[in-house]
């Protein structure tokens, strides 16, 4: 445990594989390790453009919808948190070191799947981002989800519990096959696709629970509880396999140990533990919330009606 806690005290951005030359000497420097602060490479320029575009679209969308009843403060808070986390894990310190430390990479992926995706769904963020685009593009983006369009019909199918769960599990296991995991590590294009697929499939996973527009969920609370229990099992099994495998599975052994804290096997073990425990705690929290809602619902229906 002390090895993990000492990580931030032994960082060395000077040795980072992306060509950065600034030394890092602890938590403060870790928090300053943002990709777009290092625009001496094409990746740094792309990162800066990516962050700027997302923030601009969001702010324009909020401005255009500010005089409507759609913008609820609680929704804006959820979207803002999700957007900050998205930028932090994809462009900030987490991404900066994710390609060299497996357990940090796992933190990145878990944040995308079990935090950011459900936050965006809970806030029904899509309309704000659509309204942040130019008029012609806005019309093009909104048409596929209106009326009985083909896109809406497809969405209604893939968000059904049996399909959303299956697609999520297939995607999760696919990207943890060593060949494809290592491919994403080695090539930025595949890594980008990897992150997009994680977020998209995670949204499908959470859709039957949260059910935002344009396709509402029709699951009862007991059905949602069963769904979450089924969903958590495959990810827990994968986490257990990674944790208990012993020998390194992925290509982190080709990366020099810059900080001399964790061996590659220990790094992988901690990554599996992070996937196993914090990841499952999110599902446990959802289950607890659903149980309380179910209990309250049952209590309200079982109370005798008072006669006038």
Residue ranges and their predicted role:
Residues 2-308:
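Alpha-helical membrane segments of multi-pass proteins
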């Amino acid at each position: 445990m002390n090895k993990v806690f000492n990580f931030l005290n032994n960082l060395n951005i000077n040795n980072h594989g992306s060509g950065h030359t600034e030394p890092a000497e602890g938590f403060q420097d870790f928090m300053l390790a943002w990709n777009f602060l290092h625009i001496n490479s094409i990746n740094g320029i792309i990162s800066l453009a990516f962050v700027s575009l997302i923030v601009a679209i969001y702010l324009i969308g909020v401005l255009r919808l500010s005089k409507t009843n759609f913008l609820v403060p609680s929704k804006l808070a959820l979207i803002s948190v999700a957007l900050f986390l998205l930028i932090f894990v994809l462009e900030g310190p987490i991404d900066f070191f994710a390609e060299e430390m497996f357990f940090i990479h796992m933190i990145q992926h878990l944040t995308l799947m079990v935090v950011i995706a459900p936050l965006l769904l809970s806030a029904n963020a899509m309309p704000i981002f659509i309204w942040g685009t130019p008029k012609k593009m806005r019309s093009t983006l909104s048409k596929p989800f209106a009326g009985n369009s083909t896109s809406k019909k497809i969405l209604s199918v893939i968000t059904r519990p049996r399909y959303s769960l299956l697609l999520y599990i297939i995607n999760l296991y696919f990207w943890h096959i060593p060949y494809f995991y290592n491919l994403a590590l080695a090539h930025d294009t595949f890594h980008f696709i990897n992150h997009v697929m994680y977020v998209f499939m995670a949204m499908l996973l959470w859709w039957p629970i949260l059910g935002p527009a344009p396709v509402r969920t029709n699951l009862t609370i007991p059905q949602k509880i069963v769904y979450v229990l089924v969903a958590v099992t495959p990810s827990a099994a994968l986490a257990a396999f990674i944790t208990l495998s012993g020998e390194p599975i992925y290509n982190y052994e080709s990366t020099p140990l810059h900080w001399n804290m964790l061996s590659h096997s220990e790094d992988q073990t901690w990554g599996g533990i992070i996937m196993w425990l914090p990841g499952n705690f999110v599902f446990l929290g959802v289950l607890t919330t659903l149980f309380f809602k179910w209990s309250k619902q049952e209590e309200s229906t079982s109370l005798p009606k008072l006669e006038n």
